[in-house]
Every structure is written in C-alpha cells, then in structure tokens.
C-alpha cells in the first residue's frame, strides 16, 4: 500500500476523552477532560476538529457529529501504569511502563537529598511539598527573590521542580542547580522522572508569572523506541515543544523549543514548508500547564479554539503523501477536584488528503499504536521489548 513520506504527530497535552475502566484506581471518578470543558462554556467553536470527526468519536456539547468525517478515529487505552507526561509519551513510542515512576507527593523529598542539593548548589531550600506553580510562587516567590533560596516542590507526577526568578536568581544559575538535582536524583531511592526548571518573572505576590524558559531534565528512556528506529535508519525526527526533553534527546534529529502552544503550531506550519522524510513530533503543553492543572475550563476551551484555527492551516498545507495524527498523553479534567492529571482514554485522529475512507475504528489497548504505525509506514521493525500494533493498513 501507499506509504506516507511525512508524518505529523501532534500531542494536545492532557486532552483526555473520558475515564478509563480503571480510572477509579487512580482516584478519578467520572472524569472527561474534553466533555467537561465543552459543558463549561456557552459556545465552543472548533470547526476543523469537528469536520475531522471528533464529536463522532466522543460526544461534545456545542459540537456536531460530522456527516462525512474526514478522518479515521478511535480511542486509545493506556497500557502502562500511571497518568503522567513521560509515561504517556514513552508508551506512544513503544515502551510499556509496568512500574510507576516514584513520587514524593505526600511526603516531600527526603532531608538527605535536600541537604546534598544545598551543599552542591550553595542555595538553601524552601517549599518541599506538592503544590501548583502559581500557589507556590504566591507563597514563596518574594522570599526567593529576597534570600536567593531555591523553591523546590513537586506534584502528583514524578517530578522535582525548582523555581528561580529570572532576573535575581538568573537562568544560568537555575539551570546549573537543576543539572545538579538531575544528577542526584538518578540515585534509586531519590529517582524521579523529571527535574524541571521553573523560571519566573514579576515583582511581588500576585504578579509572578512563569516564563517560557522552562527546561525539563528527563530520565533517558529505559529502552529503544520508534524514534530510535527512525533516526538509526536515516529518517528525520523533528521535535517541537518539550518532546526532546521528554525523551532526553534520544532518537531526535532536530529539536525546536516552543514559547507557547500557539508558537508550537506556528513552528509546525513552518516545518511543513520543508522537504523531509520522517516524523515531526509535536507537544503542545499549554493545555495542561496553563489550564488543566489550574482548573480553568474556560481558558482550556479558548486554547482549543486557538489550536483549531491553526489546525485549519495545517490541513490546507498537508500533501497527498502526508499523514496527520492528533492525540493526547493523558487527561487533566479542569472541572475535577485537585490539580492533577486524570486517567483517561485519549483520541487517535488520523487524516491525509489521499484517504479514500474514514470513520470509527475499534478502541486499541495501547498508546503504542502510534509508534508501531509510524514504524510500519517507513518499513521499520520496532525495537525489541516494545509494544503496540500498527493500524497503517486501515488508514486508507
């Protein structure tokens, strides 16, 4: 069958489409990120997602089912344990996470780790608890500026996050401290999935805002992924957003950092004008970071509408031998209690101008369907010990 020369995989970070059968085991009852967002607003204008068939896949208030949807679409279950960024993305590319990444949500980090971090960086530490970024800055941002102490905090994810003011603490110093933290947290008892630099600006409480100079220091994937298979066989693997950070650069041939999700789509549109063969892998993080965690369904809805405008431009630029895949890495229902991710199905929406058929496909048991399909398209074998079955033959 016909193979695609370029595949664009866009991850709308946290856009879940309803709780998985095991969601209650994760404390997530009746969650539905996309559905509840639509119910929270008076209108929801996403014509391009609508014509692809998103409302055919999942009922959405204000959005009609398409009579003739353009795309193939289905729900994907998460096979791995967890509901975090790394687990979702790693599974997409073939890895099955059977042991959850260690979290320090309830306990904070061990004093021994904090003492070593202070000793190595020269900065005292405040915080050491689970918190949202906005709350921790309101509480400790002024103190950090006045003292030079580091704000260290975590979340429901396997992360150690360090906040520093861009002007008084300095970006280079923040990155240096995070590199030390990453080295220390490779130790088994302190191991976290990611260390995240969280720079911010502002003069006082209520004015602090995190900047786009965030940097993630992730663990290397424990095995080879579809990205490695592509790169090792001479194909392009162009990342946009935090994809390269999530995989610690493994299997990436070109990395493009984004200032926002809108910027990420603008970068994707520019990449579409280039001649390459392989994968453009995009993560759009604002949905999760700005709206999901902050439990702001109205802001989330507006972000989806902005995405839909740029999606229209993507659809116009797609060539006959291009394939677009739209998906998500987990849920983050902004109407749910708390501030954490939610365990949900995610969408798989696939479209090419050359497709002759369309419609609903059967739910699959793993996000790894994506990586397997991409590898199959380029006639590559997936690395050993990966999961996922290709649906390429159905994308006609």
UniProtKB/Swiss-Prot annotation:
Q: Which residues form a coiled coil?
A: none
Q: Which InterPro entries match?
A: Alkaline_phosphatase_core_sf (IPR017850), DeoB (IPR010045), Metalloenzyme (IPR006124), Phosphopentomutase_DeoB_cap_sf (IPR024052)
Q: Which residues bind Mn(2+) 2?
A: 288, 293, 341
Binding of Mn(2+) 1, residues: 13, 329-330
- Write down the Pfam families for this protein, in alphabetical order: Metalloenzyme
Q: Which cofactor does it need?
A: Mn(2+)
Q: Give UniProt keywords alphabetically.
A: Cytoplasm, Isomerase, Manganese, Metal-binding
Entry's Gene Ontology molecular function annotations: magnesium ion binding; manganese ion binding; phosphopentomutase activity
Family of the protein in this entry: Belongs to the phosphopentomutase family.
NCBIfam families from the xrefs? deoB, PRK05362.1
Name of the molecule in the record: Phosphopentomutase
Native organism: Clostridium botulinum (strain Alaska E43 / Type E3)
Taxonomy, top ranks, is:
Bacteria, Bacillati, Bacillota, Clostridia, Eubacteriales
The gene it comes from is deoB
């Amino acid at each position: 069958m016909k193979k695609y020369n370029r595949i664009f995989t866009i991850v709308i970070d946290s856009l879940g489409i309803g709780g998985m059968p095991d969601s209650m085991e994760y404390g997530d009852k009746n969650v539905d990120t996309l559905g509840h967002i639509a119910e929270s607003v008076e209108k929801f204008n996403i014509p391009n997602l609508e014509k692809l068939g998103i409302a055919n896949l999942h009922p959405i208030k204000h959005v009609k089912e398409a009579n003739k949807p353009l795309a193939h679409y289905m729900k994907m279950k998460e096979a791995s344990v967890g509901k975090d960024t790394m687990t979702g993305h790693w599974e997409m590319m073939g890895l099955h996470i059977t042991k959850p990444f260690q979290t320090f949500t309830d306990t904070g980090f061990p004093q021994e780790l904090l003492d070593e971090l202070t000793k190595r960086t020269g900065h005292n530490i405040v915080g050491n608890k689970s918190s949202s970024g906005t709350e921790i800055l309101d509480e400790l941002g002024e103190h950090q500026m006045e003292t030079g102490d580091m704000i260290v905090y975590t979340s429901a994810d396997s992360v150690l996050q360090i906040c520093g003011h861009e002007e008084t603490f300095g970006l280079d110093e923040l990155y240096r401290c995070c590199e030390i933290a990453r080295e220390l947290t490779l130790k088994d008892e302190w191991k976290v999935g990611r260390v995240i630099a969280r720079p911010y600006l502002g003069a006082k409480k209520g004015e602090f805002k995190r900047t786009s100079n965030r940097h993630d220091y992730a663990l290397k994937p424990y095995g080879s992924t579809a990205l490695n298979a592509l790169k090792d066989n001479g194909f392009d693997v162009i990342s946009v957003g935090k994809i390269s950070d999530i995989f610690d650069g493994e299997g990436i041939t070109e990395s493009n950092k984004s200032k926002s999700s809108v910027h990420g789509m603008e970068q994707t549109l520019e990449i579409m004008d280039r001649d390459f063969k392989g994968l453009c892998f995009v993560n759009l993080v604002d949905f999760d970071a700005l709206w999901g965690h902050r439990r702001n369904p109205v802001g989330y809805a507006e972000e989806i509408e902005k995405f839909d405008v740029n999606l229209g431009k993507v659809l116009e630029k797609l060539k006959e031998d291009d394939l677009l895949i739209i998906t998500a890495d987990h849920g983050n229902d902004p109407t749910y209690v708390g501030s954490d991710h939610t365990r949900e199905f995610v969408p798989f929406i696939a479209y090419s101008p050359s497709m002759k058929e369309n419609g609903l496909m059967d739910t699959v048991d793993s996000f790894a369907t994506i990586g397997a399909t991409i590898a199959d398209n380029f006639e590559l074998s997936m690395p050993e010990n990966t999961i996922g079955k290709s649906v390429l033959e159905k994308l006609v």
